[in-house]
Amino acid sequence: MSLSFLLLLFFSHLILSAWAHGEKRLAPKGQPGPAATDRNPRGSSSRQSSSSAMSSSSASSSPAASLGSQGSGLEQSSFQWSPSGRRTGSLYCRVGIGFHLQIYPDGKVNGSHEANMLSVLEIFAVSQGIVGIRGVFSNKFLAMSKKGKLHASAKFTDDCKFRERFQENSYNTYASAIHRTEKTGREWYVALNKRGKAKRGCSPRVKPQHISTHFLPRFKQSEQPELSFTVTVPEKKKPPSPIKPKIPLSAPRKNTNSVKYRLKFRFG
């Protein structure tokens, strides 16, 4: 019995090995046979998970790259200011008869005694203390060249940045943020002469103490709606007056006949 049992085991082992070799030959290249998949199911699942992770990482990297390219394009685009920090109005210079700073579509900058469409300006903040000035009608920015000449620019550049300062007399001065005298470090200011023409900022006569550089902002303030409300004040009730105790009226006394006694003196 023992020999027959051993022979059966030997033949069964041979049959199984031959069947396994045949399956390997029939399977295509690069794909494991069923025996291999049955033997190592964990390995196949790990490979599948790694392949899915690689695909997800590549998919996530592609939108990131696209966003990066978009961000670089936005940085290269022109300056855009937020609409929340804008002030729309005019800048009035009290030099001479008084002029409103105006910007023309052809790039000319001067002053007009009467306010008009060209004198409607929009002042927006660029950074701390630095502002930009744009003409609403001309849609161009006030700029100062390297020679100190005022002109209008279609694009917002560093020449369009001005430093805004508040003076003691409630007027403002606007000096170029990048251009100044190299030797002395004197700033170049936006100024108008008595005839309403723009002065050169590099001129030694253009000083922050002179009225030609003083501008009064005249902004349109939006009318706030009238808020009406009623307040009900509770009426204070007067405390009840204390009740005076009733004093019983005493009955009138009857006049009793008074007896008069006479003193009698006895002598003797």
UniProtKB/Swiss-Prot annotation:
One of its GO terms (biological process) is glial cell differentiation. Keywords: Disease variant, Glycoprotein, Growth factor, Mitogen, Proto-oncogene, Secreted, Signal. Residues 43-80 have a biased composition (Low complexity). InterPro entries: Fibroblast_GF_fam (IPR002209), IL1/FGF (IPR008996). It comes from the Eukaryota. Its main location: secreted. Glycans are attached at N110. One of its GO terms (molecular function) is fibroblast growth factor receptor binding. It is found in: Secreted. GO terms for cellular component: cytoplasm; extracellular region; extracellular space. Pfam families: FGF. Expressed in neonatal brain. Coiled coil: none annotated. Residues 26-81, 233-255 are annotated as: Disordered. It is linked to Trichomegaly: A morphologic trait characterized by unusually long eyelashes and mild hypertrichosis of eyebrows. It can be observed in association with corneal irritation, cataracts, and hereditary spherocytosis. Interacts with FGFR1 and FGFR2. Affinity between fibroblast growth factors (FGFs) and their receptors is increased by heparan sulfate glycosaminoglycans that function as coreceptors. Belongs to the heparin-binding growth factors family. Plays an important role in the regulation of cell proliferation and cell differentiation. Required for normal regulation of the hair growth cycle. Functions as an inhibitor of hair elongation by promoting progression from anagen, the growth phase of the hair follicle, into catagen the apoptosis-induced regression phase. This is Fibroblast growth factor 5. It comes from Homo sapiens.
